[in-house]
Curated annotation (Swiss-Prot):
Assembly description: Monomer.
Gene it is expressed from: miaA
Signal peptide range: none
InterPro entries named in the record: Dimethylallyltransferase (IPR039657), IPT (IPR018022), P-loop_NTPase (IPR027417)
GO molecular function: ATP binding; tRNA dimethylallyltransferase activity
EC number(s) stated in the UniProt entry for this protein: 2.5.1.75
Binding-site positions, ATP: 14-21
Described purpose of this protein according to its UniProt entry: Catalyzes the transfer of a dimethylallyl group onto the adenine at position 37 in tRNAs that read codons beginning with uridine, leading to the formation of N6-(dimethylallyl)adenosine (i(6)A).
Family: Belongs to the IPP transferase family.
Name of the protein in question: tRNA dimethylallyltransferase
Keyword entries, A-Z: ATP-binding, Magnesium, Nucleotide-binding, Transferase, tRNA processing
């Protein structure tokens, strides 16, 4: 069978706490699928509670991919996801099964469907220099530095968004040009012709009432805290080789608990920060989803939302 004759790959996207995992598992009961995780936090081993990782029973009920694949000391890029996902789609189809992509890391989705921008590769020396500078001056100071050389990028980043500030400054140091200018130039030159529309069917879980989703987020974070999130972070800290500069420890929820264990805040403040950070993540995910014209929107609060997803998927 040629690539063109395959049905589109269904991508079930949505913000945190929108019911993606539950919907995916119900869909798996209807169709012989294998799930490809589109989640930058689920790739890490030893990080189960704060990532809302599917349970062992759920993982055993249907094949899952790109979960528990790296150590928290390591990093996993959008480029790696793109390569892995494309390979997995082919392998799953070769087994006579249906790939189902599920998650909320929109950068991964963009990489898979539109390709990656040709930006300079990460440079360990430059990153170490920026980390040292941040340790001395703080990330808001580096954000101010970024504003001087790339005001467009700086304007869309929070002063404490360490990972993105570091990447933008790294690109400027390596290329001598603002990241925003490089991205704009590459967008103008891109020959991508909209293959995402043909190869992927995007189903987006979007709440009709954001307040309900916000309440879910608070309840879920409380459940994580009661379920052992603090103890999970304590085990990560006990390793001795992890720190707040790593993408794994900067994951929403983990960072706030880590800072709490550092003595930076009390329990109530940590809880508030964790919920607020999760809601901010949700807001960014929804903004990105709603800027995706090819999506099929489904109200994740509707009682029959799983049936609607199945209909949209053609299953």
């Amino acid at each position: 069978m040629s690539v063109q004759s395959h049905p589109p790959v269904v991508c079930l996207l949505g913000p945190t706490a929108s019911g993606k995992t539950a919907a995916a598992l119900e869909l798996a009961a209807r169709t012989p699928v294998e799930i490809i995780s589109l989640d930058s936090a689920l790739v890490y081993r030893e990080m189960d509670i704060g990532t809302a990782k599917p349970t062992h029973e759920e993982l055993a009920s249907v094949p899952h991919h790109l979960i528990d694949i790296i150590d928290p000391l390591e990093s996993y890029s959008a480029a790696q996801f793109m390569t892995d996902a494309e390979r997995l789609i082919g392998e799953i189809r070769a087994r006579g099964r249906t790939p189902l992509i599920v998650g909320g890391t929109m950068l991964y989705y963009k990489a898979l469907t539109q390709g990656l921008n040709d930006l300079p590769q990460a440079d360990a020396t430059v990153r170490a220099e920026l980390d040292a500078l941040a340790a001395e001056r703080g990330w808001p100071a580096l954000h101010a530095m970024l504003a001087e050389v790339d005001p467009i990028t700086a304007a869309r980043l929070a002063p404490n968004d360490a990972q993105r500030i570091q990447r933008a400054l790294e690109i400027h140091r390596l290329s001598g040009q603002p990241m925003s200018a490089l991205l704009a130039r590459q967008a103008d030159a891109r020959t991508f012709t909209g293959a995402a529309d043909a190869r992927y069917r995007v189903i987006a879980l979007e709440p009709s009432d954001r307040a309900v989703l916000h309440a879910r987020i608070a309840d879920r974070y409380d459940a994580m805290l009661k379920g052992g999130l603090i103890e999970e972070v304590e085990r990560l800290r006990a390793r001795g080789d992890l720190h707040l500069g790593l993408p794994s420890i900067r994951c929403v929820g983990y960072r706030q608990v880590w800072e709490y264990l550092d003595g930076d805040c009390d329990f109530a403040t940590m809880r508030e920060r964790g919920i607020a950070a999760t809601r901010q993540l949700c807001k960014r995910q929804l903004t990105w989803l709603r800027s995706t014209p090819e999506r099929i929107g489904i109200d994740c609060l509707a009682p029959d939302y799983v049936a609607r997803v199945a209909d949209a998927a053609g299953w």
